[in-house]
Regions:
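RNase H-like, Mg2+-dependent phosphodiesterase core
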Residues: 1-204
Length: 204
């Protein structure tokens, strides 16, 4: 499948005079446990990566096939995390921005502009444009969505070995029925987001 339509947003931005475009996306805003992960990716203009689209539309197998391809073909990429503690301290929105800042700081090439998935962003020290459903519409954001998702999934698989009673290897920390049942039986672990569990525990 051609990626031609996935370059439309970037092509418009190139037409405005920007030369180096970075895509930014996150994974893990919603889970009850673990970090939020962000990735920033700069792809060569017009690059074709067959099958590349929003990570949520892909199987885990396909994401893992694309992961090394994106890293290999990118001009630059960066990955940043914000921990469960940081999420509890500054809230999930600001923790997401922190993870994005850390991902952008990892780039070895400075972008002229960042395209960020969603409808809100902060000033990251460079021009920023938000793109609603950007992970389905922009090559750079789609690539970032895959790097963020696979990186976070792998971290949750590691945490599943340390905390086997919660089933992180299955739900990656999201609030599934099985996860809530494990919380009822075992209580929260040290890597759970306490602010996300207040309602569950009836706290205010």
């Amino acid at each position: 499948m051609s990626n031609v339509n996935m370059w439309e947003i970037e092509n418009g931005v190139y037409g405005e005079g920007f030369e180096i475009i970075c895509g930014v996306d996150e994974a893990g805003r919603g889970p009850l446990a673990g970090p939020v992960c962000a990735a920033a990716v700069i792809l060569p203009k017009g690059l074709e990566i067959p099958g590349l689209t929003d990570s949520k539309k892909l199987t885990d197998k396909k994401r893992r096939e694309l992961f090394p391809v994106i890293k290999d073909q990118a001009i630059a990429y960066g990955i940043g995390l914000a921990s469960h503690n940081e999420i509890d301290e500054i809230n999930i929105l600001h923790a997401t921005y922190l993870a994005m800042e850390r991902a952008l700081a990892q780039l070895t090439v400075k972008p002229d502009i960042a395209l960020i998935d969603g409808n809100r962003a902060k000033d990251f020290g460079l021009p920023v444009r938000t793109v609603v459903r950007g992970d389905s519409l922009s090559m750079n954001i789609a690539a970032a969505s895959i790097l963020a998702k696979v990186t976070r999934d792998d971290l949750m698989l590691e945490l599943a070995e340390k905390y086997p009673q919660y089933g992180f290897e299955v739900h990656k920390g999201y609030g599934t029925k099985a996860h809530y049942e494990a919380l009822r039986v075992h209580g929260a672990s040290e890597i759970h987001r306490k602010t996300f569990l207040k309602k569950f525990y009836g706290e205010k």
